């Protein structure tokens, strides 16, 4: 219920921000694709483990001033997977995630085609877990999900390639994602690149 309220508040603020951007001509939206790496997902005792996955993010924002932006985004991170054997039983697990975030960005220089920026914000995360176990005769599988609130920070850069279009690269650090009741809390490093469109 608390997460649903957060989603409602973020959606409301985003709609107001978009309307304001449309009036002032200071808005932008973009899409980025890259790789996410989950810290401490692989412990070393697995027969196979992949702690990296594809990350896709869609975002939109409003320029508050010549050096500050307010931005909202949705990110999907595909499966990270691990498999191993425990007491003769084969076990496999996969986790993917959905993230909604709101972020304040501060960048410099204030003018020119190239800008670097830092960022800080909050995010709502939802992780989906799939687990399977087999003794060679029978297979058991289960699915679960969990949600919560975390933080995000990072660095980025944009370059205006033409009027109304710029190329953007980001490093995002997602903090305190996950629950101790499931696989535990972790941090996620994400590197992405993609186009951004001004309006």
What feature does the model see in each segment?
Residues 138-166:
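Short, positively charged, low-complexity/disordered linker segments
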Residues 41-44, 85-89, 136-141, 176-177:
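Extracytoplasmic loops and strand-loop junctions of Gram-negative outer membrane beta-barrel proteins
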Residues 100-102, 120-123, 149-157, 173:
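Hydrophobic alpha-helical segments of small multi-pass membrane proteins
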Residues 158-199:
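Hydrophobic secondary-structure block in the mid-to-C-terminal portion of proteins
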Residues 22-26, 33-39, 56-135, 188-199:
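Gram-negative (and chloroplast) outer-membrane scaffold detector with strong preference
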Residues 41-43, 48-50, 111:
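Sequence contexts marking disulfide-bonded cysteines in secreted/extracellular proteins
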Residues 1-26:
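Cleavable N-terminal export/targeting peptides
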């Amino acid at each position: 219920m608390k997460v649903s309220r957060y989603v409602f508040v973020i959606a409301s603020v985003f709609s107001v921000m978009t309307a304001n951007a449309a009036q002032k001509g200071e808005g932008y939206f973009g899409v980025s694709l890259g790789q996410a790496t989950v810290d401490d997902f692989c412990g070393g005792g697995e027969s196979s483990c992949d702690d990296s996955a594809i990350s896709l993010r869609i975002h939109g924002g409003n320029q508050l001033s010549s050096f500050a932006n307010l931005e909202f985004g949705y990110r999907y991170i595909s499966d990270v997977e691990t498999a191993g054997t425990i007491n003769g039983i084969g076990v496999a697990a996969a986790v993917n995630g959905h993230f909604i975030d709101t972020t304040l960005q501060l960048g410099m220089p204030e003018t020119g085609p190239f800008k670097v920026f830092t960022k800080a914000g909050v995010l709502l995360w939802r992780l989906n877990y799939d687990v399977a176990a087999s003794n060679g005769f029978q297979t058991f599988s289960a699915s679960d999900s969990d949600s919560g609130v975390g933080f995000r920070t990072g660095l980025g850069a944009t370059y205006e390639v033409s009027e109304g279009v710029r190329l953007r690269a980001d490093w995002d650090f997602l903090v305190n994602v996950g629950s101790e009741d499931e696989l535990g809390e972790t941090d996620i490093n994400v590197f992405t690149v993609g186009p951004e469109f001004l309006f």
